[in-house]
Structure formats: C-alpha cells, structure tokens
Amino acid sequence: MPYRAPLDDYNFLFDHVVGLDKVRQTDRFEDASDDLTRAILTEAGKLCEEVMAPLQRAGDMTPSYLENGVVRTADGYANGFKAIAEGGWIGMSANPEFGGMGLPTTVTTAVNEMMSAACLSLQLAPLMSQGQIEALEHHASDAIKDIYLPKLISGEWTGTMNLTEPQAGSDVGALNSKAEENGDGTYRVSGQKIYISWGDNDFANNICHLVLARLPGAPAGTKGISLFLVPKYLPDENGEAGVANSLKVVSLEHKMGLHGSPTCVMQYDDATGWLVGPEGGGMAAMFTMMNNARLGVGCQGIGAGEGAYQHALAYALDRKQGRTPVEGGSGTIVDHADVRRMLLSMKADLFASRAIALSCAVAIDMGTATGEAEWKARAAFLTPISKAFGTDVGIEVSNTALQVHGGMGVIEETGAAQYSRDVRVTAIYEGTNGIQAMDLVARKMMDGGEVANGLIDEIEAHAEAARDRFPSMVDDVWQACESLREATDWLTSETDLNQRFAGAVPYLRAFARILGGHMHLAAALADSTGGKREKLARFYIKRLMPEYVGLLAHAQSGADDLYAITVEELAS
C-alpha cells in the first residue's frame, strides 16, 4: 500500500504532549510558529509519499554496486536525493549563516522519521550529512566551515563518519588508523575503515569523510584519537571539488537489508585531511555527530515500524479468512481478537516511541536555545532511550506486521519482509542498544540519578493532574514510577559497574515503557472527546506498560548469576 505520513500524530504531539510551545517561546526559535511547522510537515509528507516511497522497493531489488571504483545506486535514487537537497531538507536545523533553515531539531526529527518510513536506505544519506554538519558547526575552524558547510547543507556534497575498523568496533580506542602532519596545516591520513554508510555515491560532487585516526606519540585509547576531515576530492582555490584524494572504496558489504544504501570498506593511503577540533579531541567531536545520529537512528526504527504497520493494517483490512467473531464486523481478519491485539500493540508502541523521540528533541532544542544545563542533561539522558527504544519498537513492529500477513509476510513481493530486513541493523549501528543502556546507567547516572528522578517526579506530577478523569490509569502510572524510582536508587547505589551493566538493558526498556505510559496519559488528557487517544492510552497502560514489572526485577538482579555458568558450560 502507499505510505501516508502520520501528520495528525506529529501535530497532536507538538501541540499537546511534547511541549514544542516551550521551544517556540525562546528567542532562537520564535519564528517556528504553528502555521510554519504544519506547512513544513505537510510538504515533507508530500516528498515522502510521492518521491521517496516509490524508491523503497527499487533500492531493495537493485542494490548499490561498485563499478570502476565508483558506487552506482538504484534507479531513481539520484533524483530522490536531488529532491531532498533542493527542498532544503538536509539543512533544516543548520545555521542560516551557511544556508540552513535554523529550525528546531524537533521538526527535523519528525521529518527524518517520515523519510525513514518512506525509504530508509535513501534517508541514511542526508542523515549522515546532517550529523557531519553539526559536528563541523561545533568543532571545525572557520576556514573549514566556510568551504564545507554551504556544500553539505545544499546537498552538493555529502558527508560520512568513519570510526569502525576490523579490530576496533565498539572499542574505538583500539583503532590503528594514523595521521601525520604535513607542515602546511594538512595531515596525511592512512588506514582502513569498515561499515561506512554511503561512503560513496553517484549523485554528489564530493563525499566528505570524518575520519578518526591517531597522531604520532598520541596516548593509547580514546584520549589519543583525533578527528580529520578527508574529502574524496580536494577543494580548489574556489572551494570547488578539485583533484582526487588518495582514498578509495575497496568493496561493498552484502547485507541482510538496506540494499539501496552502500556500506563501504574505505582505504586511506596518505590521504590529505584537515584536523577538526584539537589534537586528541576526536572522540568529543565525533560524539557530537554520533549523538545527532543516535536520535536519528531511533527515528529510523520508528519510521520503519510505521511503514510496516501501515502495510499490515492494509492487509488486515483486505484479507478475509474464517468467520468474523464480531457482529457487524468487516468480514476480514481485522475482526479477529489476536489480529486486533497485534495492530493495537503496534500503533500504541509507535505513538509512545515517537513521543519519546520528540521529547528528546525538545530537550535538545531547549538546551540549544537557553544554554541551561538542566535541559542539556535531560537531552543526554533521553538520547540513549530514544535510540534503543525507537529501534527496538521498529524491529518488534516490523516482525509483528509480518505475522499479521501470515504466509504472505515471508513472500518478498508483499514488501512486508523488507521492513524487517532493513530495520534490524538500527539496533546495532551508532552504538548497539546494549551500549546505549550501559551509557544510560553509567555516564548518564554520574549525577546520582538526579535527571532520572527528576523525570520520575515530573511523570507523577503530570499523572496527578489526570486523576479525576482517569483514576485507574493514574494509579498504574504512579505504581510504575515508584518501582522505577526503587530500581534507579539500586543502580545508583551500586558501585560495581558490571553489576549495573547486567541490568542495563531491562532498566532502559522499563524506563521507556513508563515514559510511554506518561506520553499516552498526556494524550488521553488532551483528548476531551474520549476518542482514539484515550482508548489507545488505556490499551498501552493496561496491556503494554506492565512489562516494566519483570524488567525492573531483572534490572536489580546483578551480574553474579551471569558468571555462575562457566564458558565451558555455555559451550557444552
């Protein structure tokens, strides 16, 4: 079925749930009026429905390939990217000084989710550029900004990030790539990088790589890593793409999904690069890009889930099988209780994860606009939750959508299986979801749980405002908050990080589950008619949110039983 952008959900969330009004009240974003954001979402929806969605199957059926050292993309991808670039969608939140729109990240987040639902493999290209733009805005010299930012924002050039090496995956500090100073302000960069999304393409005039490498004499580990900007073509005196640099695409990976997106093995052989940020400051600079990408990847999961849900719903409304168990039913499988359960679970989880991601974006915008540490800390706390829960939901919804299709779900022609194949990697790249959870219970709780407990307090206060209308749901949310607070206290009092890490994933999931209940309750409160928002909230809070009980028990179980079984016993 054709993709339809869920504009009603975005506008409802902006107006009633995530607090975009606070962002609009700041001096920085005062021009982001309701009329403007609605118009932007409408135009983005048209782009996704009419231009990007038709490319979804094309990229899957005709994967990118390498020809004479150049990546060739599926038919229509070049025109699709051109439409994205010409519409200004790459630079939505970028600095207007360099050609960006200067819009709130919250609006960009909604648009990125729509693009991911329409064609995830193509959306990866502008997402990588957006992350690089933000990293350069924060860390690059003025000379680099003046040359590269206008080109990246316009889409004339595209950007990538190069972290991973064969021996250095999650342990980035183990990388071997090196850089040596040339004496003229440039550096010679050498090494091999793997898993580079959109490491090359056939529609941009230049591809700009952000590469992590180590300078001579630099300390071991992440403290010795620096960041370099290494373009495919060196800019000439006019700032245009000039002579070829000493780098190449060695090969493309043959992947489970995302066939339209080239995943490259990159080789740098004394390639010319420029230092971004200070020597040894590579991880700090790269994390700017990665945090941008982590929220974006969470939205990729949600977007893929939305596309899968729409496919499943259309199939359920059309497929007739068995006798309808409800009077006045449609006669299709949507009448069957288990199918209805699956559809409601998908819809409720998508709403919850979407609301969490947009709330994270609001915190980012408020931190940017006000400079207040409280907002920045909240954004940092919500980022791993948004990434992990958004991608988990995307995977689960895509799998459930396939189940709704029955046997037709595994027949490629229906398109249902593609969502499952495409979305699976989102729980792995930009930091696995396990690493997101470890980050949450370690770095993000170095404040003794201040941000976590502040969020719990806020959920309880907002729930109390709904008690007169929804006493039963409010009681459920309150009980969940008390259990979450207890688990938070246990984690923050545990000094052995490995004991925390053993329960990190279930803790993150439980926090997201309860945040989702908070978002649904806020939606129900804003739905004065007792309509679909209230009904969906009741379904989520009564049927899905209770998962937190087992999760929090797991989160507080420690690590001892994990190591009670020996490696030999695991293999026996």
What is each residue range found by the language model?
Residues 186, 190-244:
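A short core secondary-structure module
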Residues 64, 77, 128-129, 140-177, ...:
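Internal maturation/activation junctions in enzymes
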Residues 108, 179-182, 257-287, 319-331, ...:
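Flexible glycine/proline-rich, aromatic-decorated loop/lid segments
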Residues 195-197, 234-250, 255, 262-293, ...:
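A glycine-rich, basic-preceded beta-loop-alpha segment at the flavin cofactor/substrate interface
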Residues 98, 447, 458-572:
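C-terminal amphipathic alpha-helical interaction region
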Residues 1-123, 147, 557-572:
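Amphipathic, small/basic residue-rich leader segments at the start of a protein or domain
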Residues 28-31, 61-74, 285-296, 310-347, ...:
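Glycine-rich cofactor-pocket loops
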